[in-house]
Structure formats: structure tokens, C-alpha cells
Amino acid sequence: MHILTAGVDEAGRGPLVGSVFAAAVILPETFDLPGLTDSKKLSEKKRDALAEMIKEQAVAWHVAASTPEEIASLNILHATMLAMKRAVYGLAARPEKIFIDGNRIPEHLGIPAEAVVKGDSKIIEISAASVLAKTARDAEMYALAQRRPQYGFDKHKGYGTKQHLEALKQYGVLPEHRRDFAPVRNLLAQQALF
């Protein structure tokens, strides 16, 4: 009998703006999707195509997030763990085992879980979760870019690039920015002095 195994991964821990996303995916026993690997190794076009195929073929999948406010109140690590728990609890089927990318497991999952370092390159369920989390995170950045094109979110995806830091200085901090992240926090402190 096939054991329902979920893979879990996150996207968006490092950026200065937006939510941190996590996805949980349960795949069928015979699942095979050529080219599926760690989302960071895939082009955006390939990720988007794979995401659609994963959603169509998965036994269950769920994407969840923790907001910038939750990141500020919990810290990025705990907010990531919360997003992972939400992703697991949002699955339409209950997995019997969970593999989580990285070296930490959210507390009180209630399901046997194992952390796998570089799991997004080793375990297909984690690879699938990696793709879904990354495409959801990118979608949030594209939506923000539509509302605030001057920041260039569609290009740098919220990371602390030169373009993003210059836009922060020129246009200011948005409600979506992570106020507890050093570049944003430092800019707010400088502005408070003047």
C-alpha cells in the first residue's frame, strides 16, 4: 500500500518585502515529471509550466503564507515554520509522513516529519513544493509591481538589490516591506531623525 508522503518547502525568506510562502504537496505513487528539481535551478517559464502540471496531477497540494506583520512579530524563522504548518494543515488529504526541506521541522505538526538538507534536489515531493512556493511568491511580487511599478518588484522579486534599495530611499517604505529587516529598519530610523 502506498504511504501518503508530503513534501514541504518555502520561498521568500530573504527578500525585504512581502510574505514568506510555503507549499505542501502529496504526489501519486507513479508521478514522474521530467525536469522537476529545486525551483532555484529552473527558469521562471519552466517553473510556471511545472507548477500547473503539479497542481493537475498531485493527490493534494496547498500553498500558505505568513505576512510581513507576522514576520515582524515572530521573526522570519518562526513565520516560515508557521507558513509550513498552514500548508500542511491545508492539504485535502492527510499525509502519513512529511519531508521538509532544510534542517528544521515546525513544532507540533502531529505527523511524523523529517528535515532533509537540500531536499528540494533529492525528494520529488519537496521539489514540487519548492516550485509551488516559488511561483506563489513570484505572483505576489508581480501583483505588487502592478500597484507600485517604480520599485521594480517584477525584476528583483523583493530582494535587497541596488535597484530596490535605491527605490526604497527615493519612494519610501511600503506597508508590505519587512520593517524588522535591517535595510528597511535602518532607513526608517534615518527618516525618523529628520
Swiss-Prot record:
Q: How is the cofactor bound?
A: Manganese or magnesium. Binds 1 divalent metal ion per monomer in the absence of substrate. May bind a second metal ion after substrate binding.
A GO molecular function assigned to this protein is: manganese ion binding
Supply one GO BP term. Answer: DNA replication, removal of RNA primer
At the top level, the lineage of the source is: Bacteria
- Pfam families with a match to the protein in the record: RNase_HII
UniProt entry keywords in alphabetical sequence: Cytoplasm, Endonuclease, Hydrolase, Manganese, Metal-binding, Nuclease
Q: Where along this sequence does the record place binding of a divalent metal cation?
A: D9, E10, D101
Q: Name one GO cellular component term.
A: cytoplasm
* Residues annotated as domain RNase H type-2: 3-193
User: Where is it localised?
Assistant: Cytoplasm
List the InterPro entries. RNase_HII (IPR022898), RNase_HII/HIII (IPR001352), RNase_HII/HIII_dom (IPR024567), RNaseH-like_sf (IPR012337), RNaseH_sf (IPR036397)
Its recorded reaction(s) are: Endonucleolytic cleavage to 5'-phosphomonoester
Q: Sorted alphabetically, which CDD domains does this protein's record hold?
A: RNase_HII_bacteria_HII_like
For this protein, the record's SUPFAM superfamilies field holds: Ribonuclease H-like
Report the EC number(s), separated by commas if there are several.
Answer: 3.1.26.4
Q: What class of enzyme is it?
A: hydrolase
Q: Please give the start and end residues of each transmembrane region.
A: none
Cofactor needs: Mn(2+); Mg(2+)
Gene3D superfamilies in the record: Ribonuclease H-like superfamily/Ribonuclease H (3.30.420.10)
Biological role: Endonuclease that specifically degrades the RNA of RNA-DNA hybrids.
Write out the similarity annotation: Belongs to the RNase HII family.
Q: Could you identify this protein by its name?
A: Ribonuclease HII
Could you tell me which species this protein originates from? Neisseria gonorrhoeae (strain ATCC 700825 / FA 1090)
Q: Which gene encodes it?
A: rnhB
